[in-house]
Amino acid sequence: ANPIKVHGLILRTGLIQKLSNGNSIQVLFSPRLMTDFRNIDSRHFQFGGTFIYKKVYHKRLKIGYGILYNQETFGPNVVPLVNLEWKISERWSMSGLLPIYSKVKYKVNEKLNVGIHHFGLVTSYRLGEETYQNDYIERRSIDLGLFARYNIVGGIHIEGRYGYSFGRSYSQYNQDDKIDLALPLATIRDNRTQLNESSNFSNGAYAHVRLVY
C-alpha cells in the first residue's frame, strides 16, 4: 500500500479578559481538521479548546493554570496546563504551555535567540483513503532539541530546530476502537487493537526550518 500522509489544520479563536488586579482569563476554541485529505467528511473534524487563568506574580513572572480538552478520534483528551512566562534575567527566559511545549531561551543580541525546546502532544487523524476508510492514526512523540530564531524584519522570524524524538509512534486503529479518557500519563479503559504493529516507528533525529510571524 502507498504511504499514509496525514495533515492537521488548527484554527484558534477566543477571548482574553483582563482583570482589575492585572491577572487575566483566557478562553480559546480550537476546531481542527485532522485528515489524510481523502474523502473528507464531518468525522475528520475535531473540536476542543483551552481555559487558562493567568496570575501576575511580578513583572518578570506570570503563571497560568488551566486545562485543555479535545475530542480526538480515539475519544476525549484532557490535559492539565501550566502557562509559564518567566524572564530570568536580561538574556535568559523560559516560556511554554506545559506539559505540551516549552522553551529555555538565550538572547544573543537584538535579532538572534538560541535555546532548548520540547514539544509533546498526542494527536489523531481520521483516514479517508479507501483502503483504510474505517481507521484512524494516533501520533505520539516527545521532541527535545535545540533551536535558533533570527529576526529577519519586523515581526517576521526564521527558526531552525534540530533534536531527537522519543516515544515516537503512528498507531493505526479501527474507527470503533476507542478509549474512555486520555490523560498525559494514562488512558482510561484502553483495550484497543493496533492494526499496524509491524510498522512501528523508532526514535530518531529531526530537523526543520520554519518562518514565524
Regions found by a protein language model. Give the residues of each.
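Outer-membrane beta-barrel "beta-signal"
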Residues: 81-85, 148, 154, 199-213
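Residues that define the transmembrane beta-barrel architecture of outer-membrane proteins
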Residues: 3-9, 41-47, 76-80, 98, ...
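Repeated loop/turn-to-beta-strand initiation elements of outer-membrane beta-barrel proteins
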Residues: 22-27, 59-64, 91-94, 111-114, ...
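Outer-membrane beta-barrel strand-turn architecture
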Residues: 17-21, 55-59, 88-90, 108-110, ...
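Flexible, surface-exposed loop regions and adjacent strand-edge segments
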Residues: 2-3, 43-47, 80-85, 131-135, ...
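Extracellular loop and loop/strand-boundary signature of outer-membrane beta-barrel proteins
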Residues: 1, 34-39, 68-70, 89, ...
